[in-house]
């Protein structure tokens, strides 16, 4: 068994002395609290005074430690957990903190106190702490490079154009792929007015979503330009439109429907007012060639001009002819 060194023996003796003194002090404090006779002794009064001072100090520290940690300078009186040194004369303390909350009334009071101290200092010394700002104009170099002048003029013109141009109003643009939300007062009569829409493509009528009041607005279209004379039916190709037709529009075909195809009556979903076009989804051929609507679902009531019988109301049909279905029902 190894012998203990003198240092280790000294450490053990110090720990034993401290623990014995601590236990004796604790026993004495407990005896002062429990015994009324011992509480009259002066040493018990000293113990009570020390305990009250410790409780008050811990309460003050709890009020000052409010939801953040600070390292650096701050106004005194704020609630924080501080790691640093205090300057007793100045109302500043070590700050450098991560803060999660602050008592606003305390901060206002400290700011008022600081201002009052500055004003009292000015009145006592009759001096002003503020300095006058120099009004001397900065020297200008008349021999400026002409290229720099042109660059500055271009930059100024670009900022002015961005502010005054109504076409670049309230939008985000990324080349030709952009989103714009605004109105252009100069192009009110133009059908291709870029008003409140998102466009993805080169052609004004190609691959975009527009929301407006005119006939070609308030729809999402994915197709070709309808202005091409060669393809007349491309206007109704693969788009979804929600709007109203003009006064000269005899049919309600362009009203509140989603269509996917070249034939106006082929492969679409329509919701309108007329008897034939009211509240149904149709996937079939042109009704001009065959009166029986093929492969569709309809939910609604027929009008006065509706040639479809009442049996065709509110049904789902997947067949070739309505006569065959009637024969099946009669049989």
Swiss-Prot record:
GO CC, alphabetical: extracellular region
Stretches the record annotates as Disordered:
122-158, 279-310
Keyword flag Repeat: yes
Give the Phenylalanine amide positions (modified residues).
Answer: 71, 83, 100, 174, 181, 200, 211, 222, 242, 260, 271, 283, 299, 318
Give the signal peptide as a residue range, or say none if absent.
1-25
* InterPro entries noted in UniProt: FMRFamid-related_peptide-like, FMRFamide-related_np
Coarse class of the protein's main subcellular location? secreted
- For this UniProt record, give its keywords in alphabetical order, as a comma-separated list: Amidation, Cleavage on pair of basic residues, Neuropeptide, Repeat, Secreted, Signal
What Pfam families does UniProt report for this protein, alphabetically? FARP (PF01581)
Residue ranges the record assigns to the propeptide: 26-65, 86-94, 103-168, 184-194, 203-205, 214-216, 225-236, 245-254, 263-265, 274-277, 286-293, 302-312, 321-331
The subcellular location is:
Secreted
Ranges of Basic and acidic residues composition bias in the record: 146-158, 279-296
A Gene Ontology biological process term: neuropeptide signaling pathway
Role of this protein: Excitatory neurotransmitters that directly modulate chromatophore function by activating chromatophore expansion at the chromatophore neuromuscular junction.
> What protein family does this chain belong to?
Belongs to the FARP (FMRFamide related peptide) family.
> Mind telling me what this protein is named?
FMRFamide-related neuropeptides
In its UniProt entry, the species of origin is given as Doryteuthis opalescens
Tell me the classification of the organism that encodes this protein: Eukaryota, Metazoa, Spiralia, Lophotrochozoa, Mollusca
